[in-house]
Amino acid sequence: MMKGLVIWKDGHASLEEMKKPEMGEYQALVRETAGALCGTDKEIIYDVLKGFHNYPTVLGHEGVGRVEAVGSKVKNFAVGDKIVLPFLDDGEDFYSTWGAFAEYAVIGDAEAMMEDGHTVGDGVLTEGNMAQKKIPQEFDDVEVF
């Protein structure tokens, strides 16, 4: 289990227990260390983001974390790597609006999937998969934003 900051339709927030995400063979488990609010998050909190109706939700598509475990086919991430984490999935308990305000997330290794012959139909080239990148260890987790 893990904790995540959940936003409810009426705009209030609460810290909730939820399932820790399970990683697949092309994914890595990342422990979140920092997250940032953006204008999209604010619009979701105040329920004014056009077309968004998926409450309760875990906010955050601007996060930083460290890899804690990797799937068997991951080639481009290793335990201990520092990662920029946009567009995350926080598990099954709450609809995720990217999920950086939860303790853990999974990221995909799109490059390894492509090397192994996976295609767009397999979800390889989604914006989220392509945006998840390693950053230098010496970068401060908060200053990255």
Task: Outline where the language-model segments fall.
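Short N-terminal binding/cap micro-motifs at the start of the first secondary-structure element
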Residues: 12-15, 39-40
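Conserved hydrophobic/aromatic beta-strand scaffold that supports enzyme active sites
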Residues: 15-17, 64-66, 82, 104-106, ...
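Glycine-rich beta-strand-centered segment in the early N-terminal region that forms part
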Residues: 21-36, 48-99, 111
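Cytochrome P450 core scaffold surrounding the K-helix E-X-X-R motif
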Residues: 40-46
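NAD(P)H dinucleotide-binding glycine-rich loop of Rossmann-like/cofactor-binding domains
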Residues: 90-145
